[in-house]
Amino acid sequence: MARSIKKGPFVDGHLAKKVEAAVASRDRKPIKTWSRRSTILPDFIGLTIAVHNGRQHVPVLISENMVGHKLGEFALTRTFKGHAADKKAKR
């Protein structure tokens, strides 16, 4: 179910403050955050945000195509190692 338009996009307050400060100072240093649930706004374009994936912070460079998506979509939490090899194929 999509979020109501009248509510607007959700962004954690502490992340919004960090983004405003980075834009004002033109700081290129990655912004570290644990807020995977925050929506990417047009203000974030060009910034690098380090999103926590449960183990480490994954740097995500925000582009125009990402606006409207959540930060967590770009920091994968699971590592796929591949399916088990077929035993018949080894013979």
Swiss-Prot record:
Any GO CC annotation of this UniProt entry: cytoplasm
GO molecular function: rRNA binding; structural constituent of ribosome
Pfam families, A to Z: Ribosomal_S19 (PF00203)
Annotated InterPro entries: Ribosomal_uS19 (IPR002222), Ribosomal_uS19_bac-type (IPR005732), Ribosomal_uS19_CS (IPR020934), Ribosomal_uS19_SF (IPR023575)
Record flagged with keyword Membrane: no
One Gene Ontology term from the biological process aspect of the record: translation
Origin: domain of life: Bacteria
Keywords: Ribonucleoprotein, Ribosomal protein, RNA-binding, rRNA-binding
SUPFAM superfamilies documented for this protein: Ribosomal protein S19
Entry annotated with the keyword Disulfide bond: no
Protein function: Protein S19 forms a complex with S13 that binds strongly to the 16S ribosomal RNA.
Family in the record: Belongs to the universal ribosomal protein uS19 family.
Protein's name according to its UniProt entry: Small ribosomal subunit protein uS19
UniProt organism field: Methylobacillus flagellatus (strain ATCC 51484 / DSM 6875 / VKM B-1610 / KT)
